[in-house]
Swiss-Prot record:
SUPFAM superfamilies (UniProt xref): Protein kinase-like (PK-like)
Extracellular side: 21-254
Protein name: Cysteine-rich receptor-like protein kinase 24
Limits of the Gnk2-homologous domain: 21-124, 130-235
Native organism: Arabidopsis thaliana (Mouse-ear cress)
This protein's record includes keyword Membrane: yes
Major localization listed first in the record, in broad terms: membrane
Entry superkingdom: Eukaryota
Amino acid sequence: MVKFLVIFWFVVISFSHVSAQVCLERSGFFTPNSTYDLNRRVLLSSLPLNVTAIDGFYTTWIGEHPNRAYGLGMCVPGTDAHSCSDCIILANARLLQNCTNQTEAIVWRIDRTVCLVRYSNRSFYSSLGMEILRSDNYTRDFQANLTDLEITWEALMIRMIDQASYLYYAAGIRKLETSISRIYGFVQCSRDLSLQNCTKCLQQNVVEYRSCCRGRQGGIILRPSCFIRWELYPFLGLFDNIRPRQKDGKSISTGAIVAIIVVPILLLALGVGLWKRRKAYKTKTTKIADDITTSGSLQFEFKAIEAATCNFHNVNKLGHGGFGEVYKGTFPNGTEVAVKRLSKTSGQGEEEFKNEVFLVAKLQHRNLVKLLGYAVKGDEKILVYEFLPNKSLDHFLFDPVKKGQLDWTRRYNIINGITRGIVYLHQDSRLTIIHRDLKAGNILLDADMNPKIVDFGVARNFRVDQTEATTARVVGTIGYMPPEYVTNGQFSTKSDVYSFGVLILEIIGGKKNSSINETDGSISNLVTYVWRLWNNEPLLELVDAPMGENYDRNEVIRCIHIGLLCVQENPADRPTMSTVFHMLTNTSITLHVPQPPGFVFRVRFKPNPLADRLQRGPSTSMSFSCSVSVTCVSPR
């Protein structure tokens, strides 16, 4: 473990407000008002808005080496935006006031909610920080049965750590056997950790409890990467919807704890034995459902899906995606959903189905379409999504009439929203996720025209230490796929960057990437067309005519520039999506001069209809609004 000197330790202790702040020497010091200090202040000021906008968790960096500042902000998932923002603002103020020249500092603030703010001159993302920042037993000794307290406390912690191993946080209540008292507990990990390291950090806090806080009525243990807190009273409003785990009058003993562990294992073994004896039809259904271990609570009854879609009536059909059809469904309570029915004949169907459920069920971000659940029945595999009324982006962008609804403000907002969504997939989600099929048809629009990324059927997740991979099966949409993926099957986060670059150019120009008829009679793709404009002709010729002159010229030119940087032939020359986000939101960042992009061509021939269909690829339109009404009549 790296040893370091704690320069400043600030602790405020009360029953309503707990915080711990540490300014660290290990990374050195900076000169006040230096470039690093400025970057640090800009970084901290960006956290309150971005943390609340991106599901309560945000990582970023500002500046260039050696003055780059890395930062992280986090609130408990589900915290209302106002409380989260206030907590981050107060944490920032504490750091700026007390860590005047330390290049690294951490603060956990626990007031009306829990928040974490951290900055450094080095990248600490995904690193496990195990130094104890604070270990306090600031309440009185427990006066009743200590054995009961110990058993109940450890049982509660085991359950919460298990839940945090896939959610990064957990709150719980457990009643003592020998008194009316209840233990209220809360655990939280920094969401940049791997799930394995989250569990490891929390388990070490349990070990620390035994040496610092055994027998106390309450306490808190804080590390850079995680913390635990427990009390004999509810705190932070975390327990309003939680019922005590142990019923009144029921004892919990060592034998009971063992039973809790052993019985499910025995039942699982018995279930596996029965599972192997079932008919093939039942076997396949159970296999898929059992594989999706993280999403059991999301399962719908297949009959309920049939009823909601009028038995998949054609009038409810919204569109056709890469691996199946999409229908509109309406449940008896009036809730509207989009139902994706995977094709039975697709050789990729089952794999893609499980992949999508595994990935999407773990993702929570305002720029991603929310997966509500799934259903399986034999060969039938169903995904249920939130219903978005405004169709997909391509229905507006490439329609000569509807594109008029997309002024520059809306288009710029769509570009920024897509950027945030991909940054979350690549960097801020629990796994590094590569979409591999980003296109206008996979960007849905909500009622306010905010973008939401959909269709994770071909998505791939990476290990933390993995940067690229190779596939023998190239999937996606021609025109959006980068050269290294088409020719060699190599993909990485830079594959999505390429697709995003094409998408930016389509959004600005209102033109499909598939083919552009140039003035000299030749045919090229959109990337080639924009590259020619960049070198020889007015760049703003690209701007979609319906926007007229009502746009910010500098914003448009900068977005075109970023689009060209994203479609560079060499993946190493493309920026990361995090860098793209900073390029869009910070105009002081100087952009590099782009080199010729990948797939630049110019050929004189007439378009081939078949090739044109291949170039466009399948498009999912999950929000198509059908004007025909159908009444489902159920038999009496």
